[in-house]
A protein has these predicted regions:
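A hydrophobic alpha-helical transmembrane-helix feature that marks the membrane cores
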Residues: 64-70
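Conserved helix-turn-beta segment immediately C-terminal to the redox Cys motif
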Residues: 19-21, 38-57, 61
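Conserved redox-active cysteine motifs that mediate thiol-disulfide chemistry
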Residues: 26-40
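A short beta-strand-turn-helix
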Residues: 3-22
Length: 106
């Protein structure tokens, strides 16, 4: 599954109006833990076989979204369901914890 680049322009359509849960990854290219997390999220998306959208928000490019969600530390993961943020995690987490967070949001 390709990564979905989320911007201020497509946030409402891709996240708030999504018919499936969305896992957002707030990251930066220079962030070591963010780089470690990226393949984990890709793997999780593959395992969910289209039942989960995974979107990436570059906080350096999308400062408006970073401020809107009060991102003070990265990586930060937020799960959206039915247009609402239902779970949040800050820092690197193993795939099992992220999967549990997503499942808990269903």
């Amino acid at each position: 599954m390709a990564e979905l680049k989320i911007t201020a322009a497509n946030f409402e359509n891709e996240v708030l109006h999504s018919d499936k849960p969305v896992l957002l990854d707030f990251y930066a290219d220079w962030c070591g833990p963010c780089k470690m997390l990226s393949p984990v999220l890709h793997e999780l998306a593959e395992e969910k076989n289209g039942a989960l959208k995974v979107g990436k928000i570059n906080v350096d490019e999308q400062m408006e979204l970073a401020m809107r969600f009060q991102v003070s530390s990265i990586p930060m993961l937020v799960v959206f369901k039915d247009g609402k943020a239902v779970a949040k995690s800050v820092g690197y987490r193993p795939k099992s914890e992220i999967a549990a967070m997503v499942e808990g949001a269903r």
